[in-house]
Amino acid sequence: MIAEAMAQEPGSELISETQVPDAEHAGGFPPFDAASFESQLVWLVLSFAALYLLMSRVALPRIANVLEERRDRIADDLDQAAQFQLQTEEAIGAYEKALAEARAKAQGIAQETRDRLQEETERQRLAIEARLAEKISEAEKQIAATKDAALQNVRAVAVDVADTIVAQLLGDSDRSATERAVDTELS
C-alpha cells in the first residue's frame, strides 16, 4: 500500500528498465590493460622511490631514534638498578654490622649484669654466713654455758647423792672427800 502510494505521487517518474553504458567498460580492468603497462611501471617506480625516500629520510630515522632512546633508557635503568643493588648491599652490611654490635653490646650488658648479680649474691652469701657463724658461736657459747650450768647442777646433785649414799652406808660422810671423788670422776 505504501509502495503504491509512493509510486503514484506527482513528480515521480517510474523507471522500468536499467541501462548500463557499454563504452566505458568495454576495455576491461585498467591495470590489466597491456597498453598501459609502461605508464603503470613508471608510476610504480616513482611511487616506490618516493616511498623509499620518505621512509629512509623520515620514518626510519625516527624509529632508529626511538630504538636508541629505548636502548639508552634501558642502559640507564640497568645502571640505576646496579647502583640500587650496591646501596642495598651496603645497607644490609651496615644493618648486619649494627646488629652484630648490638648483640655484642647486649651480651656485654648481660655479662656485666650477671657478674654484678653474682658479686652481689656472693657478698650477701658471705654476710649471711658471717651472721650464721656469729649466731652459731653465740649458740655454742650458750650451749657451753648451759652445759656448764648443767654440769654444775649434775656435780652438785652427784655430790649430794654420793654424800647421802656414803652417809647411809658408813653412817658418817666427809663432804670434801666426796666432792673430790665426784670431781675426779667427772673430769
Swiss-Prot record:
Subunit and interaction comment: F-type ATPases have 2 components, F(1) - the catalytic core - and F(0) - the membrane proton channel. F(1) has five subunits: alpha(3), beta(3), gamma(1), delta(1), epsilon(1). F(0) has three main subunits: a(1), b(2) and c(10-14). The alpha and beta chains form an alternating ring which encloses part of the gamma chain. F(1) is attached to F(0) by a central stalk formed by the gamma and epsilon chains, while a peripheral stalk is formed by the delta and b chains.
Keyword Nucleus attached: no
Subcellular location: Cell inner membrane
Function: F(1)F(0) ATP synthase produces ATP from ADP in the presence of a proton or sodium gradient. F-type ATPases consist of two structural domains, F(1) containing the extramembraneous catalytic core and F(0) containing the membrane proton channel, linked together by a central stalk and a peripheral stalk. During catalysis, ATP synthesis in the catalytic domain of F(1) is coupled via a rotary mechanism of the central stalk subunits to proton translocation. Component of the F(0) channel, it forms part of the peripheral stalk, linking F(1) to F(0).
A GO cellular component entry from the record: plasma membrane
Bilayer topology annotation: Single-pass membrane protein
PANTHER family: ATP SYNTHASE SUBUNIT B, ATP SYNTHASE SUBUNIT B', CHLOROPLASTIC
UniProt KW keywords: ATP synthesis, Cell inner membrane, Cell membrane, CF(0), Hydrogen ion transport, Ion transport, Membrane, Transmembrane, Transmembrane helix, Transport
Domain of life: Bacteria
Regions crossing the membrane: 39-61
GO molecular function annotation: proton-transporting ATP synthase activity, rotational mechanism; proton-transporting ATPase activity, rotational mechanism
Repeat in keyword set: no
Family recorded in the similarity comment: Belongs to the ATPase B chain family.
Record-given protein name: ATP synthase subunit b 2
